[in-house]
């Protein structure tokens, strides 16, 4: 390891790097043995040259003592997960190497049994439906989605969060639940939608606190909210909880907008306020569900990437995400002032002035710049959800002249600019630290739109 970085990396990553620097004589898995199998042939050598020796050297069995078993929660692996829990404000963290689909199923399996009532955000990911309904045979009550006229999903419709109605639905489906203080074992809420809206976790907690034992916030499309002053208050992990509140589980797709390899995910558990109560989910129960769903042959670099994500966010998170949000605002302004046919989804007029005429710092300091709706009744309808500053949803029907978003998507991709997704008249761009250099490359193509 380079002298200037030695001792500055988190424990699991440093141990892994040190291990790969030593000559190994493995008689265990994986069979490529640090790439040696591939290097027996010219074609294999081309393969290892492309990826680099470190990728193969770091792919090792968990049979050895160093750097330890990533699934054990002990030693350097345990220290890595503790770092993530501390960084994100949780009591415990589990690193999951097979995506948030698996993380969601783990949480459902840990909490739900046959005929338990589960309150489901209708916009839940399929993994939630699989875990809660197919695997656990729980009974669902769905919360309707709030949709814009062009089909964009903006979160849960607050009218479906009526406690009296939800208790009535629970009693209709499971009559004996009428006598329970909290009829629902679990509620599942999408913290951030794929269309670029973020829920106010404090509002959700206030509406559901008397109804359920636990809330699972599926934050697959979030995770950075607590590192931005604008969105910090929206995070479930910044909430101060009492024994009157549900326990919280948060799943995050670290690979989506955070710093992780594809498939890396984490489960964050915040429920120490329930310890000793009957509704408390013991760590070992969640761990058993975790062990049921993971591979016994983990890819160590994936685990290391999750540790590095926590390490970087703990040390630099606020600065990096503030810079990313600043870039996202500047890009929105550039599109609004340069483009004729496309526009980012935003409240266009704020206190009588166009959105883009305000300073970037002011836009990033006040929620009103991110509250969807122009009229008072419209704003009230969306008051519990906010436009995500780090997701730019472009609409291709500016000034009432719609054209297929796919045309713009293909045009941009020909110029090596790749949107996250494309709808009929919308394009989604994800913004994260490191994107600032893209501004100069995207300016000219978008100017023509």
Give the predicted meaning of each segment.
Residues 1-54:
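N-terminal glycine-rich, Lys/His-bearing helix-loop that initiates the first secondary-structure elements
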Residues 12, 72, 100-113, 117-336:
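Conserved PLP-enzyme active-site core in the AAT-like
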Residues 53-102:
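Conserved N-terminal alpha-helix of the aminotransferase class I/II PLP-enzyme fold
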Residues 285-393, 425-426:
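Structural motif of enzymes handling amino- and sulfur-group chemistry
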Residues 395-402:
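Short, surface-exposed ligand-recognition loops at beta-strand->loop->(often short) alpha-helix junctions
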Residues 402-412:
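Short amphipathic alpha-helix segments
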Residues 413-428:
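Conserved PLP cofactor-binding pocket of PLP-dependent enzymes
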Residues 440-449:
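Single conserved hydrophobic/aromatic residue that forms the stacking wall/gate
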């Amino acid at each position: 390891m380079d002298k200037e970085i030695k001792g500055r990396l988190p424990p699991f990553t440093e141990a892994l790097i040190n291990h790969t620097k030593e000559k190994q004589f493995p008689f265990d898995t994986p069979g490529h043995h640090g790439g040696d199998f591939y290097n027996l042939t010219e074609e294999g050598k081309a393969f290892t040259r492309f990826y680099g020796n470190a990728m193969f050297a770091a792919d090792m069995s968990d049979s050895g003592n160093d750097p330890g078993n990533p699934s054990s929660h002990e030693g350097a692996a345990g220290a890595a997960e503790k770092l993530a829990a501390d960084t994100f404000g949780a009591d415990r963290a589990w690193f999951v190497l097979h995506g948030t689909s698996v993380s969601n199923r783990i949480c459902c399996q840990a909490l739900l049994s046959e005929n338990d009532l589960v309150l489901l955000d209708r916009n839940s990911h399929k993994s939630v439906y699989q875990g809660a309904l197919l695997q656990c045979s729980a009974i669902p009550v769905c919360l309707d989605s709030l949709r814009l006229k062009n089909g964009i999903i903006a979160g849960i419709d607050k009218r479906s969060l009526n406690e009296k109605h939800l208790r009535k639905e629970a009693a209709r489906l499971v009559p004996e639940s009428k006598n329970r203080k909290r009829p629902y074992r679990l509620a599942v809420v999408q913290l951030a939608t794929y269309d670029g809206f973020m829920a106010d976790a404090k509002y959700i907690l206030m509406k559901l606190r008397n109804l359920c034992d636990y809330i699972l916030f599926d934050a697959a499309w979030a995770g950075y909210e607590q590192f931005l002053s604008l969105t910090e208050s929206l995070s479930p992990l910044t909430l101060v909880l009492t024994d009157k509140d549900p326990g919280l589980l948060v799943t995050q797709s670290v690979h989506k907008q955070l710093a992780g390899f594809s498939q890396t995910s984490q489960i964050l558990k915040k429920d120490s306020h329930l310890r000793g109560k009957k509704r408390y989910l013991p760590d070992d129960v969640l761990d058993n569900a975790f062990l049921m769903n993971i591979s016994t042959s983990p890819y160590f670099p994936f685990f290391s990437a999750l540790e590095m994500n926590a390490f970087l966010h703990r040390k630099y998170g606020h600065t990096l995400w503030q810079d990313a949000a600043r870039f996202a605002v500047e890009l929105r302004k550039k599109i609004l002032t340069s483009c004729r046919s496309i526009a980012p989804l935003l409240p266009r007029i704020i206190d009588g002035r166009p959105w883009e005429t305000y300073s970037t710092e002011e836009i990033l300091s006040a929620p009103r710049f991110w509250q969807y709706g122009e009229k008072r009744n419209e704003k009230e309808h969306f008051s519990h959800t906010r436009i995500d500053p780090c997701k730019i949803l472009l609409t291709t029907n500016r000034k009432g002249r719609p054209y297929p978003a796919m045309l713009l998507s293909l045009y941009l991709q020909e110029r090596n600019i790749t949107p996250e997704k494309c709808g009929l008249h919308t394009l989604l761009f994800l913004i994260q630290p490191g994107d600032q250099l893209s501004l100069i490359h995207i300016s000219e193509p978008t100017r023509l739109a």
